[in-house]
């Protein structure tokens, strides 16, 4: 019997790791990856950090160039897909070529959620999703330039840190009452706000842009009535899933391709993962997790499901952010207001713990990444703690 053919659509973390996972889990059939980018699939996290700060930055490939040939994975870069061919099982390219598939994994990622008021500025307005975006930003983030960043989420704050380190004058505008409100617990939000302010970043909370005038500098009028002058305007206010191909194929979409716990779409032969995917939970709610690790998890889960293997057990959600000299790692459940702190954040070394009825359900480390392995095990096992154990620095965490 002829082995099935699997096609992967996308050029990022989830797409590359799906190819790797399929081979690692024993798939020996024909395997193709189609991407509209010219590069090998590359790591996205460095785009807001090292790609802006290093003297001679290089894209970091998810897998080395030799891996693709050695593992007999056919890589099609710089191509545009016209249709997925859900009914015919034939992927059609813009150049007219068609490619048969038996199973399909879609990992087309996401674009920056548009902000029409700023998009009208054309090339004077920047977002960050791809390597080309980082290259353009690197050119314009020059010393003494005034930079306005709209959005104080993870990307906005990482860009603020990088621009400040490039000696720009940075202002961040955030509609909410805090920074990183979607991702960080209250004590970490307060720490990051103070950290950026101490670095010279002006952060305007509970505010938004009302009017924009393009001139020698961009003039931005805020809801508060204040007017800002900017050489560079950047925004990051969320994502818009690249789900057009899926919508045209009549897959279930809601700003993302709806998947189940096996990364399967409403078509049993089509799977999706990474930022383009949104999971329908058992209670019917839709949940999206935008992180490097989530892309890897989706790749492993989808590969197992495609091959009819048991699904891997998922670790607690985890992501990291590098801002200035700080490395913050977030693991587990970030909800709740009653967090314990071990150490002193003012020394830039601390761990915040989230206990629920004595059970550790989440944590954030500040320049204490070596503790993440133990914390992950504790969260997975549902380990209980006395609050004094976790906060007493005289008690080594590894002894608990």
From Swiss-Prot:
Keyword Isomerase: no
Keyword terms, alphabetized: Aromatic hydrocarbons catabolism, FAD, Flavoprotein, NAD, Oxidoreductase
A GO cellular-component term linked to this record: cytoplasm
GO BP of this protein: 3-phenylpropionate catabolic process
GO molecular function term, any single one: ferredoxin-NAD+ reductase activity
EC number: 1.18.1.3
Record text on subunit structure and interactions: This dioxygenase system consists of four proteins: the two subunits of the hydroxylase component (HcaE and HcaF), a ferredoxin (HcaC) and a ferredoxin reductase (HcaD).
Name of the molecule in the record: 3-phenylpropionate/cinnamic acid dioxygenase ferredoxin--NAD(+) reductase component
Organism: Escherichia coli O157:H7
Gene: hcaD
């Amino acid at each position: 019997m002829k082995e099935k053919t699997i096609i992967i659509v996308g050029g990022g973390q989830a797409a590359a790791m799906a190819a790797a996972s399929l081979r690692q889990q024993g798939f020996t059939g024909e395997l193709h990856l189609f991407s509209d980018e010219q590069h090998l699939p590359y790591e996205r996290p460095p785009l807001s950090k090292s790609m802006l700060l290093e003297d001679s930055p290089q894209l970091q490939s998810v897998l080395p160039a030799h891996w693709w040939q050695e593992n007999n994975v056919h890589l099609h870069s710089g191509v545009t897909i016209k249709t997925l061919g859900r009914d015919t099982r034939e992927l059609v390219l813009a150049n007219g070529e068609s490619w048969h598939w038996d199973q399909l994994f879609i990992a087309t990622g996401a674009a920056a959620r548009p902000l029409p008021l700023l998009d009208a500025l054309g090339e004077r307005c920047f977002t960050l999703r791809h390597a080309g975006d980082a290259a353009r930003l690197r050119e314009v983030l020059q010393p003494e330039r005034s930079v306005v960043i709209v959005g104080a989420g993870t990307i906005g704050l990482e860009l603020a840190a990088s621009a400040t380190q490039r000696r720009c004058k940075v202002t961040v505008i955030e509609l909410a009452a805090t920074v990183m409100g979607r991702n960080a617990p209250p004590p970490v939000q307060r720490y990051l706000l103070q950290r950026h302010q101490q670095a010279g970043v002006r952060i305007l909370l509970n505010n938004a842009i009302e009017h924009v005038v393009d001139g020698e500098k961009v003039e931005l009028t805020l809801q508060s009535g204040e007017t800002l002058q900017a050489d560079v305007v950047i925004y990051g206010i969320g994502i818009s899933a690249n789900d057009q191909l899926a919508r045209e194929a009549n897959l279930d979409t809601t700003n993302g391709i709806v998947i189940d716990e096996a990364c399967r779409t409403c078509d049993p032969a089509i799977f999706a993962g990474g930022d383009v995917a949104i999971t329908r939970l058992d209670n019917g709610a839709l949940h999206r997790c935008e992180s490097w690790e989530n892309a890897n998890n989706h790749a492993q889960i989808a590969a197992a499901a495609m091959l009819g293997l048991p699904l891997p057990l998922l670790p607690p959600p985890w992501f990291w952010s590098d801002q200035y000299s700080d490395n913050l790692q977030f693991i587990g459940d970030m909800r709740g207001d009653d967090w314990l702190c071990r150490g002193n954040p003012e020394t830039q070394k601390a761990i915040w713990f989230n206990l629920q009825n004595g059970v550790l359900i989440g944590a954030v480390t500040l320049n204490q990444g070596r503790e993440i392995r133990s914390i992950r095990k504790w969260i997975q096992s549902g380990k209980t703690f006395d609050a004094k154990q976790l906060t007493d620095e005289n008690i080594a965490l590894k002894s608990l």
